[in-house]
Amino acid sequence: MRIESLLQHDVVERILERLAVNSLPRFKAVSKQWKSTIESQFFQGKHLTHRQQSGDPVVLMVTVYNDDSPHVGSLLLGSRRTRNPTTLII
């Protein structure tokens, strides 16, 4: 199953806002929608504002329940201060 079908796009945007600028180019290859989002002026403004106003959340957790199977996916993002900042289980 593709990640775009597991996560709503607004959740994806919130996650992308919290990533370092130098990591964003590789996420443009995930899908046309992600590429379009990352390249939009609106997203770039939100990303810059987020970086200026906060030091990232300690943890952002998204859990996805899929009706087609009992599989549950989780995405955990830590702040820049955590030792193991990203865990993706989907």
Curated annotation (Swiss-Prot):
Q: Which InterPro entries match?
A: F-box-like_dom_sf, F-box_dom
Show where the F-box domain sits. Answer: 1-46
This protein's name: Putative F-box protein At5g16285
Q: Enumerate the Pfam families for this protein.
A: F-box
